[in-house]
């Protein structure tokens, strides 16, 4: 008997651990363990919890077609999860537990405990690199060191990369679940002891998600480099939630991208999308090799000396989308209402929080994780530290997004703003990015500016220069 432990890899197709178990020729069982207390500590978004719950029902059906039952337990935290998986493995008389690696520190420690408990029972623990196309540690400098800058990492990644070939799984022999374990089999009536927000606008079944990937790579990726920065357009893939919980693998995305390309030659848009996938790999690799990133520490040494003002009232207004800067407010309201935010907008609001309001990037990082359906620790941490200029290969500290010019450039007619900030629907495009200049501003029920961007830019330059010494 082989037991596969699912975590953030909720798919039966192109799942390294599952494929290894199926290829063993032995009966296979699967397990998912919910850890609500740990999720609270990690600020898991209720909308992502709901997507995970819905996905489990789909995964159970996919596994049933392979004659693999899905067991489910809810325990408090990662330590209890390690105990639970070792107990189930013992009960099943499993000879091996297989799982795909998570790279964050808490997750690594969970797996170390599981390995220890299983070893004491004579059960083999096998962990696989499945989250990335190229596993952490495989992309190094000529001196054998890890890359700390993205561009040379990308060049090395492309040199090592070969378009993946993805095969199909074959069912294993059917086996009957012991009656003593019947109550542990997943059924849709089960629910997490954790808040959930409806995620049904996002598909949970693999075929719909796979079709979305196919259609994007076939029909829209060619314009990705031009369309991706405009939030009013459908210019992005919207696949990030499925990468975050593992409905899709990065390999599947890259394989489909090349499959739909002409003679294996990527268009400019396809190259830019591939570059974004490599950014994702870069941040995953960093988290795997830099434990301090999992402790919410600045990547750069001088980041610890940065002075943050951390005004609670201003932070709350930022969270609610009431800063008086329309593109910032539209973005935050999109996040709060849908659980998703366009990538260009993530950079704008992160820059505004850290460099206009002088609020610690960790506050924004946690808030994003608590709201995003595509919350992924490595990507979220990497993005926030990039914007705050404290991260690995972060933007220069003197690069400070102007929320007015960003809105004018990427939402020139104000279509996105009008969608999410109804107070400004009657304001013409000439004034919508700076409503404080609107002649009839007193008739508009929209917040005044929290701060003056020009003044706060000078403050930021001073604070960062002081921290850098």
Swiss-Prot record:
It is an enzyme of class 4 (lyase). One of its GO terms (biological process) is response to light stimulus. InterPro entries: Crypto/Photolyase_FAD-like_sf, Crypto/Photolyase_N_sf, Cryptochr/Photolyase_FAD-bd, Cryptochrome/DNA_photolyase_1, DNA_photolyase_1_CS_C, DNA_photolyase_N, Rossmann-like_a/b/a_fold. Pfam families: DNA_photolyase (PF00875), FAD_binding_7 (PF03441). (6R)-5,10-methylene-5,6,7,8-tetrahydrofolate binds at residue 107. Its EC number is 4.1.99.3. It catalyses: cyclobutadipyrimidine (in DNA) = 2 pyrimidine residues (in DNA). Binds 1 FAD per subunit. Binds 1 5,10-methenyltetrahydrofolate (MTHF) non-covalently per subunit. The occupancy is 0.2. Usually had equal molar flavin and folate. The keyword DNA damage applies. Keywords: Chromophore, DNA damage, DNA repair, DNA-binding, FAD, Flavoprotein, Lyase. Residues 1-133 form the Photolyase/cryptochrome alpha/beta domain. Gene3D superfamilies: 1.25.40.80, DNA Cyclobutane Dipyrimidine Photolyase, subunit A, domain 3, HUPs. GO terms for molecular function: deoxyribodipyrimidine photo-lyase activity; DNA binding; FAD binding. Its cofactor is FAD; (6R)-5,10-methylene-5,6,7,8-tetrahydrofolate. Monomer. NCBIfam families: PRK10674.1. Belongs to the DNA photolyase class-1 family. Involved in repair of UV radiation-induced DNA damage. Catalyzes the light-dependent monomerization (300-600 nm) of cyclobutyl pyrimidine dimers (in cis-syn configuration), which are formed between adjacent bases on the same DNA strand upon exposure to ultraviolet radiation. This is Deoxyribodipyrimidine photo-lyase.
């Amino acid at each position: 008997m082989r037991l596969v432990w699912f975590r953030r890899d909720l798919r039966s197709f192109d799942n390294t651990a599952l494929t290894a178990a199926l290829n063993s020729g032995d009966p296979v069982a699967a397990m998912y363990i919910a850890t609500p207390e740990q999720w609270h500590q990690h600020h898991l978004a209720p909308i992502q919890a709901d997507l995970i719950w819905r996905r489990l029902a789909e995964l159970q059906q996919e596994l049933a077609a392979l004659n693999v039952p899905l067991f489910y337990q809810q325990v408090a935290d990662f330590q209890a999860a390690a105990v639970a998986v070792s107990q189930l493995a013992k009960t099943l008389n499993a000879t091996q537990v297989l799982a795909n690696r998570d790279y964050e520190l808490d997750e690594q420690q969970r797996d170390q405990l599981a390995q220890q408990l299983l070893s004491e029972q004579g059960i083999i623990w096998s962990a696989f690199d499945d989250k990335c196309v190229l596993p952490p540690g495989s992309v190094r400098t000529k001196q054998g060191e890890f890359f700390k800058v993205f561009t040379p990492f990308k060049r090395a990644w492309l040199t090592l990369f070969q378009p993946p070939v993805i095969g199909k799984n074959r069912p294993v022999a059917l086996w009957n679940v012991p009656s003593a374990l019947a109550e542990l089999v997943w059924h849709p009536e089960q629910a997490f002891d954790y808040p959930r927000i409806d995620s049904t606008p996002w598909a949970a079944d693999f075929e719909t998600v796979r079709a979305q990937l196919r259609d994007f790579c076939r029909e829209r990726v060619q314009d990705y480099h031009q369309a991706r920065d405009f939030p009013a357009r459908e210019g992005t893939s919207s696949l990030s939630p499925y990468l975050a919980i593992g409905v899709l693998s990065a390999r599947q995305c890259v394989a489909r991208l090349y499959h739909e390309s002409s003679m294996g030659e990527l268009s400019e848009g396809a190259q830019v999308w591939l570059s974004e996938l490599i950014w994702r790999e870069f941040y995953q690799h960093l988290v795997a090799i830099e434990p301090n990133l999992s402790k919410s520490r600045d990547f750069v040494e001088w980041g610890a000396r940065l002075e943050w003002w951390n005004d609670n009232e201003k932070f709350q207004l930022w969270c609610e989308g009431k800063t008086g800067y329309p593109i910032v407010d539209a973005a935050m309201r999109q996040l709060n209402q849908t659980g998703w935010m366009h990538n260009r907008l993530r950079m704008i609001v992160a820059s505004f929080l850290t460099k206009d309001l002088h609020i610690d990037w960790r506050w924004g990082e946690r808030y994003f994780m608590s709201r995003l359906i595509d919350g992924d620790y490595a990507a979220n941490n990497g993005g926030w530290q990039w914007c705050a200029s404290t991260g690995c290969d972060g933007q220069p500290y003197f690069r400070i997004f102007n929320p007015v010019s960003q809105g004018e450039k990427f939402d020139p007619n104000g279509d996105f703003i009008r969608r999410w900030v109804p107070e400004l629907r009657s304001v013409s495009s000439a004034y919508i990015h700076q409503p404080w200049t609107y002649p009839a501003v007193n008739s508009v029920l929209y917040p005044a500016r929290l701060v003056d961007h020009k003044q706060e830019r000078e403050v930021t330059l001073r604070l960062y220069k002081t921290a850098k010494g």
